[in-house]
């Protein structure tokens, strides 16, 4: 058994972002991570730095996402300085393509609702008909009737981000332990005792950033983390010599040249295997948008489970019963990485989350049940 000041449970994008941010703030956390075969959203990530459409009926989430996207370039520079790794950030805006007038109208209504709910502070967006879209994006198929464009959106190499955060956090002083799945957390008068197979840690403070495991661990420190099943699937093509003309909600070209196709969700499957039916739907929609993709072979497909809360909005919490315990859960680990590292981590270091983050507390679910 050994003693530390701060332990982060979980070494995915959320945990690593916070660990790097803490190390930059002068605190050297211990990061306890699970096994390589664990269900890791961080390694199945699409890599979007995305604002468009987020935060419908949750203006605080819409503005939080936008704020993080805006400071992503600042984070990228600092992360490159600390790790020597370029995470491939590209922020040139993105499109949501519609294959029917009804689809375009539904997206437009959502975007207008977000603009209204945020009092006009959400990023500007353009509603484009087919001709306007064609003037901006060449090579579209005949089924595309229009699009929504938002200049705030971008993408990055999610695996490079994962590697950069791990490299940077350790260079700045964080300690990392893989194959250290935490099984129990016991609050004490001095902090917390974390136990797993073959190890015990006494920690004065603890941060739960364990993804899907948060739901199990949260009650041990007087918190809750209600999650729902959200399985996504991604197709990846061979490397293309021709650049995809733009970024969109369901398609992005990786910096290595392959094209990633995604945007599916299964809510009733616990299997990690991919579905041929979903692959067919993803491929069909992609070809309707960009018919030229028919010249490319799909090389691989994978699935992942999003860390999606019961209402889809991040949970940021601190324990009232056991001071020193914090919890963070979200399915936007890439988009929100900048906020987690540059804003949230310093608050953890100070010992208290600021009041403006209280809207993300899981206590909101108690209030909803009481209504």
Swiss-Prot record:
Uppermost EC category = oxidoreductase
Cysteine disulfide partners in this protein: none
**Does the keyword section mention Transmembrane?**
no
Q: Name one GO cellular component term.
A: cytoplasm
Query: Which keywords has UniProt assigned to this entry?
Result: Oxidoreductase
Give TM segment ranges.
none
| E.C. code | 1.-.-.-
For this protein, the record's InterPro entries field holds: FAD-dep_OxRdtase, FAD/NAD-bd_sf
Q: Which pathway is recorded for this entry?
A: Opine metabolism; octopine degradation
Q: What does this protein do?
A: Oxidative cleavage of octopine into L-arginine and pyruvate.
Q: How does it assemble?
A: Heterodimer of a subunit A and a subunit B.
> Can you name this protein?
Opine oxidase subunit B
Provide the species name. Answer: Rhizobium meliloti
